[in-house]
Curated annotation (Swiss-Prot):
The keyword Acetylation applies. GO terms for biological process: glucose metabolic process; glycolytic fermentation via PFL pathway. Disulfide bonds: none annotated. This is Formate acetyltransferase 1. Its EC number is 2.3.1.54. It holds the Pfam family Gly_radical. It is an enzyme of class 2 (transferase). It is found in: Cytoplasm. The keyword Repressor does not apply. One of its GO terms (cellular component) is membrane. SUPFAM superfamilies: PFL-like glycyl radical enzymes. GO terms for molecular function: formate C-acetyltransferase activity.
Length: 760
């Protein structure tokens, strides 16, 4: 114990004392020790020769992936765990931060605990043979999450999956949406964290012996035992790279490396849809500042270490199927890093390291990963606002989320974004990811008595279809409300099953080891097709919509007479309908019982599944044709927001965060000239636009999320025809960024047909 205390004292030398020394409390450490920065980017250094050499090597593999739409390589015989692979390098002599998921760059691992079927599907898609022993083990001896879920699913849920009224459920792959507090590895070292977990384990003994909440207590004891074991395995993994992480980091290089080792353990053992990195830049700046002041490193060396960390995050890959890629296209893993924001005490959390992270988009060029997310506040330093705006204009690689909305909601300044738009407090909260429900199809079920318009089979509860020649708004709304009740029940039932089985068969021990003992859980539901449903209701209410029926009386098309207000133009007649749908569905979800008493939340988010949803949904009363993509996330339907940027932003900002606390995704594309004639004016105008969209006060809620693309449609058309000219072209789509060349032609076309705002 004295040896551990000596390690702690040495590592913490020069830091301001606080509660963080007596308990696991990273926020307190940051608040006591960080240096806010309000200056500009002039201090930044460029790429070193080592960085350029390493990144050129990585880009060879990335270009191959772009060209083939297939993995560079993947395992077929080794089930991945924290310790399953030997050390891997790009070029060991040049790397300042080390660690790969497997023994080779961009080689993907087998992670079978979520489900063997996805692995079999991937092997088949890419003409590789899965080792028969892997299949035998995970079919006959070791049950998977996927098998557990399908053992318990109801016939109703299976029909909902087949029809696409529920899509993307994490029932065949890792759920993700959990952020380990990877900073804890650097600040405390593994031995301290293992000691803390042992104390947590012991704290449950009295409840266990007295039969208090017996099942929950036994489960938590087992989970903590697994967490403790995972921490030990992290030490073993790091030792393969020549590092002893039993004690805390003693300098900036170790702080970055230790933090990354915590994350590497997560992505070696889990293939979650979103494996977010957290909120590390300000934490790491404390170590960098200490070393800079002591003359131990230069600014060039600081940037190089950040570059090599970010390079590793860019290289994380999971083995997926083409069907998965349709929903989440372009290999996203959502290594989301939340940057900036303001502290509860009024100081900015922007540091020089916030700039260094953004600078990687210049030292190594644009990239979709890590999913860099600016926590925007009107009170952010002006220099940082303008630099972030410049980075968006130059790279289209950033997303923005409203710190002035979320910080007071949590009463906490140490939250981060999981996945795309979903906030949670780091190390204290986790999400049960729930994909999304299709509101546009739900409306068609209301009109057709629960019969699916594409499959021509009964999916929803059997009821009389609407019979009249003209759709009546009140009748449609009454029936839709009934079908939303049904859908909410199917949805929550499915998610309860999924997350019970994931905890049982694919528990995220390494991630949860970097959480407190008792965490807050949210049941993160979602809706898709919001603008389609709102516009359809608007058409029914304000125009005349006549259903066209087939020989079986099924409404398969709609004829619209007259004009109707469309979402995205700051028209309260339709905007209020969208607001009502969000609030209405959330209230229905909130009435239902959730697994582990998770707090129900909801997102308005689609990822790239707006294309898949469109394929699965027939003609809708707004005039959208069968198969046409939905507007992504909370976006208006393509081309319908005709009154400029401010009107479109205003419509989306009306959607209530109080009923969508899992996030509201809005993707905004604007041509450069619409922002101004020169770079300085464009930076100022883009920053001003975000100040306006995110402006938040008690009486007027600000928008929650904004993807920003600044580019011309002509460039995207050229990139479709000449992909080799644009190997790193990055664009923002619903909730994340993606290399344009990694999208399918269909998805590229969808992006190109979206609204490119020509005026403010």
């Amino acid at each position: 114990m004295s040896e551990l205390n000596e390690k702690l004292a040495t590592a913490w030398e020069g830091f301001t004392k606080g509660d963080w020394q007596n308990e696991v409390n990273v926020r307190d450490f940051i608040q006591k020790n960080y240096t806010p920065y309000e200056g500009d980017e002039s201090f930044l250094a460029g790429a070193t020769e080592a960085t350029t050499t390493l990144w050129d090597k990585v880009m060879e593999g990335v270009k191959l992936e772009n060209r083939t739409h297939a993995p560079v390589d993947f395992d077929t015989a080794v089930a991945s765990t924290i310790t399953s692979h030997d050390a891997g390098y790009i070029n060991k002599q040049l790397e300042k931060i080390v660690g790969l998921q497997t023994e080779a760059p961009l080689k993907r691992a087998l992670i079978p605990f979520g489900g063997i079927k996805m692995i079999e599907g991937s092997c088949k898609a890419y003409n590789r043979e899965l080792d028969p022993m892997i299949k035998k083990i995970f079919t006959e001896y070791r049950k998977t999450h996927n098998q557990g879920v399908f053992d318990v699913y109801t016939p109703d849920i299976l029909r909902c999956r087949k029809s696409g009224v529920l899509t993307g459920l994490p029932d065949a792959y890792g759920r993700g949406r959990i952020i380990g507090d990877y900073r804890r590895v650097a600040l405390y070292g593994i031995d301290y964290l293992m000691k803390d977990k042992l104390a947590q384990f012991t704290s449950l003994q009295a409840d266990l012996e007295n039969g208090v909440n017996l099942e929950q207590t036994i489960r938590l004891r087992e989970e903590i035992a697994e967490q403790h074991r995972a921490l030990g395995q992290m030490k073993e993994m790091a030792a393969k790279y020549g590092y002893d992480i039993s004690g805390p980091a003693t300098n900036a290089q170790e702080a970055i490396q230790w933090t990354y080792f915590g994350y590497l353990a997560a992505v070696k053992s889990q293939n979650g849809a979103a494996m977010s990195f957290g909120r590390t830049s300000t934490f790491l700046d404390v170590y960098i500042e200490r070393d800079l002041k002591a003359g131990k490193i230069t600014e060039q060396e600081a940037q190089e270490m950040v570059d090599h960390l970010v390079m590793k995050l860019r290289m994380v890959r999971f083995l997926r199927t083409p069907e998965y890629d349709e929903l989440f296209s372009g290999d996203p893993i959502w290594a989301t890093e939340s940057i900036g924001g303001m502290g509860l005490d009024g100081r900015t959390l922007v540091t020089k390291n916030s700039f260094r992270f953004l600078n990687t988009l210049y030292t190594m060029g644009p990239s979709p990963e890590p999913n860099m997310t600016i926590l925007w506040s009107e009170k952010l330093p002006l220099n940082f606002k303008k630099f972030a705006a410049k980075v968006s204009i130059d790279t289209s690689s950033l997303q923005y989320e409203n710190d002035d909305l979320m910080r007071p909601d949590f009463n906490n300044d140490d939250y981060a974004i999981a996945c795309c738009v979903s906030p949670m407090i780091v190390g204290k909260q986790m999400q049960f990811f729930g994909a999304r429900a299709n509101l546009a199809k739900t409306m068609l079920y209301a009109i057709n008595g629960g019969v699916d318009e594409k499959l021509k089979m009964q999916v929803g509860p059997k009821s009389e279809p609407i019979k009249g020649d003209v759709l009546n708004y009140d009748e449609v709304m009454e029936r839709m409300d009934h079908f939303m009740d049904w859908l909410a029940k199917q949805y929550i039932t499915a998610l309860n099953i999924i997350h019970y089985m994931h905890d049982k068969y694919s528990y995220e021990a390494s991630l949860m080891a970097l959480h407190d003992r008792d965490v807050i859980r949210t049941m993160a539901c979602g809706i898709a097709g919001l603008s389609v449903a709102a516009d359809s209701l608007s058409a029914i209410k304000y125009a005349k919509v006549k259903p066209i029926r087939d020989e079986d009386g099924l409404a398969i098309d709609f004829e619209i007479e007259g004009e109707y207000p469309q979402f995205g133009n700051n028209d309260p007649r339709v905007d209020d309908l969208a607001v009502d749908l969000v609030e209405r569905f959330m209230k229905k979800i909130q009435k239902l019982h959730t697994y582990r008493d998770a707090i129900p939340t909801q997102s308005v988010l689609t990822i790239t599944s707006n294309v898949v949803y469109g394929k699965k949904t027939g003609n809708t009363p707004d005039g959208r044709r069968a198969g046409a993509p939905f507007g992504p996330g909370a976006n208006p339907m393509h081309g319908r927001d005709q009154k400029g940027a401010v009107a479109s932003l205003t419509s989306v900002a009306k959607l209530p965060f109080a009923y969508a606390k899992d996030g509201i995704s809005y993707t905004f594309s604007i041509v450069p000239n619409a922002l101004g004639k020169d770079d300085e004016v464009r930076k100022t105008n883009l920053a001003g636009l975000m100040d306006g969209y995110f402006h938040h006060e008690a009486s007027i809620e600000g928008g929650q999320h904004l993807n920003v693309n600044v580019m011309n449609r002509e460039m995207l058309l050229d990139a479709m025809e000449n992909p080799e000219k644009y190997p790193q072209l990055t664009i923002r789509v619903s909730g994340y960024a993606v290399r344009f060349n990694s999208l399918t032609k269909e998805q590229q076309q969808d992006v190109i047909t979206r609204t490119f705002t020509q005026s403010m």
